């Protein structure tokens, strides 16, 4: 009892101990915590918690900086582009299949045509027109404005038109006129279609060969003298941006020397259906051909050129009319 009382007396006399608050800081070996600073400590994530993802805008910025496409981004082929590619494949396949029996027909007729209609070759033109109209019918519509301005089929004239697309020739065949057009030499080597161009008597040219150009112009004058109309694309080649470039004087010097009329033609829509350089795509749409009034014969080729270009430009939207002095580059 004496021992217990002494312990109780000691407990009463003991001074109170002040308890210091302890920080919930994990102990780490080799690191001494600062006693006077209270910093928030990171909380370890729960294994079941999902990591927070940055916003998509941040992903877009990082992906753009790194040039890495995002899933579902615009770098993936768009459905309309895929559809345009499928349409182009179908168009060329259909056109080629149509050309097979028609080419055989042209081969059979060739001896008679050369014997009795060497220059105009009207029978071959009839086959060409049939082929072109049947090729385009399932894919786009061609509307002709100013058909009353077309001269008779047997009248020798110079047709001039703006050049936007591979489809220009297909579309112009809808005019049902037996014109000869000028095309680069390599096109005549295309199986079936190029051979058909040769049988029809179209004119080949190497645009970077001066002698070939002079020979082409002389051949056009000979055709006009024999009563065959001729079609020129005075820009010289297709426009990459659909803007009409300056006209070269070759077609108008031929018309001036032959003393024939010049018929300006405006093509609308072919460049949007199948742009130059994108022949692997065929977009939906329609083509409009505007036939302007014929320009009377004129011995001044420069005046004919200016008047024809103004007529063609009059039916084009202003944004598709380029500078008259800006010439398209020559190509082989």
Curated annotation (Swiss-Prot):
It is a multi-pass membrane protein. Its EC number is 2.3.1.51. It is an enzyme of class 2 (transferase). A motif (EGTR motif) lies at residues 235-238. The keyword 4Fe-4S does not apply. GO terms for molecular function: 1-acylglycerol-3-phosphate O-acyltransferase activity. One of its GO terms (cellular component) is membrane. A motif (HXXXXD motif) lies at residues 163-168. It comes from the Eukaryota. Pathway: Phospholipid metabolism; CDP-diacylglycerol biosynthesis; CDP-diacylglycerol from sn-glycerol 3-phosphate: step 2/3. The chain crosses the membrane at residues 96-116, 185-205. Keywords: Acyltransferase, Lipid biosynthesis, Lipid metabolism, Membrane, Phospholipid biosynthesis, Phospholipid metabolism, Transferase, Transmembrane, Transmembrane helix. One of its GO terms (biological process) is CDP-diacylglycerol biosynthetic process. It catalyses: a 1-acyl-sn-glycero-3-phosphate + an acyl-CoA = a 1,2-diacyl-sn-glycero-3-phosphate + CoA. It is found in: Membrane. Its main location: membrane. PANTHER family: 1-ACYL-SN-GLYCEROL-3-PHOSPHATE ACYLTRANSFERASE, 1-ACYL-SN-GLYCEROL-3-PHOSPHATE ACYLTRANSFERASE-RELATED. Converts lysophosphatidic acid (LPA) into phosphatidic acid by incorporating an acyl moiety at the sn-2 position of the glycerol backbone. The HXXXXD motif is essential for acyltransferase activity and may constitute the binding site for the phosphate moiety of the glycerol-3-phosphate. Belongs to the 1-acyl-sn-glycerol-3-phosphate acyltransferase family. This is 1-acyl-sn-glycerol-3-phosphate acyltransferase CHLREDRAFT_174358. It comes from Chlamydomonas reinhardtii. The lineage of its organism: Eukaryota, Viridiplantae, Chlorophyta, core chlorophytes, Chlorophyceae.
């Amino acid at each position: 009892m004496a021992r217990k009382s002494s312990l109780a007396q000691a407990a009463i006399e003991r001074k109170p101990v002040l308890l210091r608050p302890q920080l919930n800081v994990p102990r780490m070996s080799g690191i001494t915590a600062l006693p006077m600073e209270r910093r928030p400590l990171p909380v370890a994530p729960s294994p079941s918690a999902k990591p927070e993802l940055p916003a998509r805008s941040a992903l877009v910025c990082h992906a753009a900086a790194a040039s890495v496409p995002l899933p579902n981004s615009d770098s993936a082929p768009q459905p309309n582009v895929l559809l345009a590619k499928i349409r182009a494949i179908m168009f060329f396949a259909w056109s080629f299949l149509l050309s097979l029996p028609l080419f055989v027909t042209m081969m059979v007729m060739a001896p008679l045509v050369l014997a009795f209609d060497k220059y105009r070759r009207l029978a071959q033109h009839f086959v060409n027109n049939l082929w072109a109209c049947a090729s385009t019918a399932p894919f786009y519509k061609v509307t002709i404005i100013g058909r009353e301005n077309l001269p008779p089929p047997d009248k020798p004239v110079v047709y001039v038109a703006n050049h936007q697309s591979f489809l220009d020739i297909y579309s112009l065949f809808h005019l049902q006129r037996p014109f000869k057009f000028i095309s680069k030499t390599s096109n005549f080597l295309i199986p079936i279609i190029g051979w058909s161009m040769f049988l029809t008597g179209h004119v080949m040219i190497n645009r970077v060969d001066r002698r070939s150009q002079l020979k082409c112009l002389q051949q056009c004058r000979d055709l006009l003298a024999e009563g065959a109309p001729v079609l020129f694309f005075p820009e010289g080649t297709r426009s990459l941006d659909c803007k009409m470039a300056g006209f070269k004087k070759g077609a108008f010097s031929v018309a001036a020397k032959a003393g024939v009329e010049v018929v300006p033609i405006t093509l609308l829509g072919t460049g949007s259906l199948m742009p130059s350089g994108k022949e692997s795509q065929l977009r939906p749409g329609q083509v409009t051909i505007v036939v302007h009034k014929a320009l009377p014969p004129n011995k001044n080729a420069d005046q004919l050129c200016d008047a024809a270009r103004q007529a063609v430009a009059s039916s084009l939207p202003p944004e598709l009319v380029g500078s008259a002095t800006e010439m398209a580059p020559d190509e082989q």
